[in-house]
């Protein structure tokens, strides 16, 4: 039997959600994520070609990925650059091809620019978490290098595994044959959740609870998927940029999408960082309310509760 929804619990949930939204709104106003997103969008466009060049270089170093480079490129451009993906892919591949012909000094410069992007992301997210302790140069460089090297490899490995599973004969003609296309269709969503979850768990120089990071990752992934579809519809139905800029329309379109993407990433980070703050604030309010009720009945009990709460806060700080 389906249990009836308790009106008190529903009221408490709605009220808590509303209070959390108020807290989140205050946080967004303080952090000015629109300005930070603009900065990250600028750095991303500056680092886009170096990042793609480094990614493709890493994939070419592993023979197992040689046959799926086109798949990986198509997956990235189709799922992360709506509507203008084909045009952007042509230009970026041409730029990457030119960059790969450069000298060792030029390639090293590309690596530095790519690391600049990761460093900017690191600083932006740690500012959201209000972290004051900075990582050492060795730890930071190791983390950035791991992202540059392992990121493309993990992406390629996931696509290889997916292609292998789909091609298995056990799925052909079985009851699961209809499930596989659905799973493949949902792959971008799963990939988005996993990517955001990894960012929110690893990048902040502070311990982040898995549930909080998962909540922020799911919200960000949903907004990202809806944003892709909405942005593609807007470009198709209202081709304003193409009418104004003509052949150069790809540039403002790409910048707008990158900016919107960073807004979504930072919003998910704000949700993740705001969760423990709100829960601590609510718990503190409950403790104060309990103390006031106890004081009304017995001052001695009030003193005991106050002492216990203060000791608990000191232990948490330590």
Curated annotation (Swiss-Prot):
Major localization listed first in the record, in broad terms: membrane
Organism: Shewanella sediminis (strain HAW-EB3)
The protein's name in its UniProt record: UPF0761 membrane protein Ssed_0302
InterPro entries xrefs: UPF0761_bac, Virul_fac_BrkB
A Pfam family assignment: Virul_fac_BrkB
Membrane topology note: Multi-pass membrane protein
GO terms for cellular component: plasma membrane
Keyword annotations: Cell inner membrane, Cell membrane, Membrane, Transmembrane, Transmembrane helix
Location of the region described as Disordered in the Swiss-Prot/TrEMBL record: 282-318
Record's compositionally biased regions (Basic and acidic residues): 282-298
Disulfide bonding pattern of the chain: none
Cell compartments where the protein resides: Cell inner membrane
Family affiliation: Belongs to the UPF0761 family.
Transmembrane segments: 45-65, 102-122, 137-157, 179-199, 206-226, 247-267
Keyword presence, Membrane: yes
Residue stretches of biased makeup (Polar residues): 301-310
